[in-house]
Amino acid sequence: MKKVLFVATVVKTHIMEFHIPYLKMFQDMGWETAVAARNDYEDPTDCKIPFCDTYYDIPFERLPWKAANIKAYRELKAIIDREHFDIIHCHTPVGAMIARLAAFFFM
């Protein structure tokens, strides 16, 4: 089965607002869908992403120089190396930069 990973800095204010139709489209085509983003819900248990098979809570920060982004890079790189995604769909400036760096040697 083919696998797609959507990467953005946050879930509630980005993934949920813009990418649900694309997650559904990939699932309808038989793909396994995954999302990597920080859970920005006030109550973390409210984070339920429709049409997402696997969710990775990555500690992205919106400011690129924050130390948490180093941890986010390491976590995302481990996920990409382990899961072998066919497509990595990058969004938001910091999330996209970290995803591209994490996937650089994988491609």
Language-model features, listed with the residues they occupy:
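Short beta-strand scaffold positions
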Residues: 6, 89-90
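Structural motif
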Residues: 3, 86-87
